[in-house]
Amino acid sequence: MAKHDLHLTRNIGIMAHIDAGKTTTSERILFYTGLTHKIGEVHDGAATMDWMEQEQERGITITSAATTTRWKYAGNTYKINLIDTPGHVDFTAEVERSLRVLDGAVAAYCAVGGVEPQSETVWRQADKYNVPRIGYVNKMDRSGADFFEVVRQMKDVLGANACPVVIPIGAEESFKGVVDLIKMKAILWHDETMGADYSVEEIPANLVDEANEWREKMLEKVAEFDDALMEKFFDDPSTITEEEILRALRAGTLKMDIVPMFCGSSFKNKGVQTLLDYVCAFLPSPLDTPAIVGTNPTTGAEEDRKPSEDEKTSALAFKIATDPYVGRLTFFRVYSGKVEAGSYIYNTRSGKKERVSRLFQMHSNKQNPVEVIGAGDIGAGVGFKDIRTGDTLCDEDAPIVLESMEFPDPVIGIAVEPKTQKDLDKLSNGLAKLAEEDPTFTVKTDEQSGQTIISGMGELHLDIIIDRLKREFKVECNQGKPQVNYKEAITKTVELREVYKKQSGGRGKFADIIVAIGPVDEDFTQGGLQFIDEVKGGNVPKEFIPSVQKGFQTAMKNGVLAGYPLDSLKVVLKDGSFHPVDSDQLSFEICAIQAYKNACAKAGPVLTEPIMKLEVVTPEENMGDVIGDLNKRRGQVEGMESSRSGARIVKAKVPLAEMFGYVTALRTITSGRATSSMTYDHHAQVSSSIAKAVLEEVKGRVDLV
């Protein structure tokens, strides 16, 4: 790819709540940019971007498909790498890793539903990765559609500085098009060409005053970011040119000070071309984003890499997928330098050089072979033997580790076994491949029962895994009841001396440590082990201290109550002693593991459970039943409000253990009139009666609490 093209490259994603019409919008983008000749509809199960069979059956997007397309705007041809992301909360890992490699995003909303719970989650994820975005209010043709109400909700709920750049012409059945407030023209779409043709006309007389009013509001907003514009705005707003407005809106969007707002009806083929024009106008190119910062694994120093093909190569693997034809496909974003087909590239995690046999740019799940993927671009490669999501790929002579992605721990598990013993190998092979693709899906063997336990982000997540085992790996499974992924914590600090001694003829083993073990400090927010070395005078030699730390890190994976992991732990190594012959690294590691077990048992161990944030939208007359049911489930109602449609919104925090089968129960209570959505919020300590019940089930004993 020629270097100057980077100005004309856009790496974008469409992010939203489930059912806001993301996939339909992506389909229209592919149709209007000429990549597909027939529009695939989600409700027919034919959408190009939803390529897994389960997605086509369920009408939701599970894996984020990456597609490269082109669009002409203002005399230039722009290259758009479009990533379609799922809106269901069970698939937040897909959203998280997409946002990590994007430069900009389109936040899509339903004109009726507005800002929904998953919209908030995704918005926070985009804030975390500093992704500039524009807003698109979809489904303007639906009954109850209200563009301005969604703009207000964006301000109130998300704290976004939402700024309409278009206003709708009509709404619901009469939605025909938009008024572009920059050009001050009406854009009307024609049904007979499926929206491919549209006309630019004068603003309808009944909308002129409203358009002038909204244009003035837009000018006032953008003038805040540009002193020269502010002057013109107060002197004579009519002298402000189109170029000046575009420049100021782009600057405000890139700084994340403003969110330009658009609207349309993707399903009815209206509004998508305007959206594409302004994706090119306002969202950043790879050159607008700061140089990527990474760590040199040799020196530990921070280094940055600019988005140029002349720099040393750095790329981040953000997704791994298994393709039936080419095998394992690794999707990556190249930040600097270039990756060439047939070349070798170094993986800083594995410390190995790997040959990239072939490179592709993707159109949904079809591969278009390319020879090179340069800085600022997204593509997929084949040939990697040992690769994981979040790995950094670079030149061997210039190693760098880019910040990887953080994924939440799975919250729900089920036991699985193949229906026939001969499928055992197929099952473990299938599970290993699926775990490789999805960092929020884990597989482990229960030490006591020997069962295989798979864990994920929710019931739908695990349903789809079971479904994929059946379709892709031809393994039928029996599955157990869902289990909650509890964790353990300690509540007190305990000081303890641990001595590990072993004499078995010849050289023995010896380690001696004095440690204080307790909850982490309040300002230690990253989780994991907070390890502090206070040993004076070499009583424990420096080379053994990492072994003590490693011992505690290993031990934290199994708590003393029921073998559930600890999220965080503070260990202060105060003193100890060693033997000049018998002490070695393994002795100190084993000594630390023993110290952990003995100290945690005395440090007030408790069980914690996942608490979910629940939102239920229900008719007024079912409110009492819904709240009564939540109370039975140990739920805490945190608030109630009215929606625009007259329904009531109930917000609550409820333990996941009480929520299995909730969707069916809610349907029964409200005769199918209520909907709910649930996201993980935090882990909280369980009461002693529940802890006893869990321990009885897991351990067959309750004397530990």
UniProtKB/Swiss-Prot annotation:
<comment type="function">
    <text>Catalyzes the GTP-dependent ribosomal translocation step during translation elongation. During this step, the ribosome changes from the pre-translocational (PRE) to the post-translocational (POST) state as the newly formed A-site-bound peptidyl-tRNA and P-site-bound deacylated tRNA move to the P and E sites, respectively. Catalyzes the coordinated movement of the two tRNA molecules, the mRNA and conformational changes in the ribosome.</text>
</comment>
<dbReference type="InterPro" id="IPR009000">
    <property type="entry name" value="Transl_B-barrel_sf"/>
</dbReference>
<dbReference type="InterPro" id="IPR009022">
    <property type="entry name" value="EFG_III"/>
</dbReference>
<dbReference type="InterPro" id="IPR035647">
    <property type="entry name" value="EFG_III/V"/>
</dbReference>
<keyword id="KW-0963">Cytoplasm</keyword>
<keyword id="KW-0648">Protein biosynthesis</keyword>
<dbReference type="InterPro" id="IPR027417">
    <property type="entry name" value="P-loop_NTPase"/>
</dbReference>
<keyword id="KW-0251">Elongation factor</keyword>
<dbReference type="GO" id="GO:0005737">
    <property type="term" value="C:cytoplasm"/>
</dbReference>
<dbReference type="Pfam" id="PF03764">
    <property type="entry name" value="EFG_IV"/>
</dbReference>
<comment type="similarity">
    <text>Belongs to the TRAFAC class translation factor GTPase superfamily. Classic translation factor GTPase family. EF-G/EF-2 subfamily.</text>
</comment>
<keyword id="KW-0547">Nucleotide-binding</keyword>
<dbReference type="Pfam" id="PF00679">
    <property type="entry name" value="EFG_C"/>
</dbReference>
<keyword id="KW-0342">GTP-binding</keyword>
<dbReference type="InterPro" id="IPR035649">
    <property type="entry name" value="EFG_V"/>
</dbReference>
<protein>
    <recommendedName>
        <fullName>Elongation factor G</fullName>
    </recommendedName>
</protein>
<dbReference type="GO" id="GO:0003746">
    <property type="term" value="F:translation elongation factor activity"/>
</dbReference>
<feature type="binding site">
    <location>
        <begin position="138"/>
        <end position="141"/>
    </location>
    <ligand>
        <name>GTP</name>
    </ligand>
</feature>
<dbReference type="InterPro" id="IPR000795">
    <property type="entry name" value="T_Tr_GTP-bd_dom"/>
</dbReference>
<feature type="compositionally biased region" description="Basic and acidic residues">
    <location>
        <begin position="302"/>
        <end position="312"/>
    </location>
</feature>
<dbReference type="InterPro" id="IPR000640">
    <property type="entry name" value="EFG_V-like"/>
</dbReference>
<dbReference type="Pfam" id="PF14492">
    <property type="entry name" value="EFG_III"/>
</dbReference>
<feature type="region of interest" description="Disordered">
    <location>
        <begin position="293"/>
        <end position="312"/>
    </location>
</feature>
<dbReference type="InterPro" id="IPR014721">
    <property type="entry name" value="Ribsml_uS5_D2-typ_fold_subgr"/>
</dbReference>
<dbReference type="InterPro" id="IPR020568">
    <property type="entry name" value="Ribosomal_Su5_D2-typ_SF"/>
</dbReference>
<dbReference type="InterPro" id="IPR047872">
    <property type="entry name" value="EFG_IV"/>
</dbReference>
<dbReference type="GO" id="GO:0005525">
    <property type="term" value="F:GTP binding"/>
</dbReference>
<feature type="binding site">
    <location>
        <begin position="84"/>
        <end position="88"/>
    </location>
    <ligand>
        <name>GTP</name>
    </ligand>
</feature>
<feature type="domain" description="tr-type G">
    <location>
        <begin position="7"/>
        <end position="287"/>
    </location>
</feature>
<dbReference type="InterPro" id="IPR004540">
    <property type="entry name" value="Transl_elong_EFG/EF2"/>
</dbReference>
<dbReference type="GO" id="GO:0003924">
    <property type="term" value="F:GTPase activity"/>
</dbReference>
<dbReference type="InterPro" id="IPR041095">
    <property type="entry name" value="EFG_II"/>
</dbReference>
<dbReference type="InterPro" id="IPR005517">
    <property type="entry name" value="Transl_elong_EFG/EF2_IV"/>
</dbReference>
<dbReference type="Pfam" id="PF03144">
    <property type="entry name" value="GTP_EFTU_D2"/>
</dbReference>
<dbReference type="InterPro" id="IPR004161">
    <property type="entry name" value="EFTu-like_2"/>
</dbReference>
<dbReference type="InterPro" id="IPR031157">
    <property type="entry name" value="G_TR_CS"/>
</dbReference>
<dbReference type="Pfam" id="PF00009">
    <property type="entry name" value="GTP_EFTU"/>
</dbReference>
<feature type="binding site">
    <location>
        <begin position="16"/>
        <end position="23"/>
    </location>
    <ligand>
        <name>GTP</name>
    </ligand>
</feature>
<dbReference type="InterPro" id="IPR005225">
    <property type="entry name" value="Small_GTP-bd"/>
</dbReference>
<dbReference type="GO" id="GO:0032790">
    <property type="term" value="P:ribosome disassembly"/>
</dbReference>
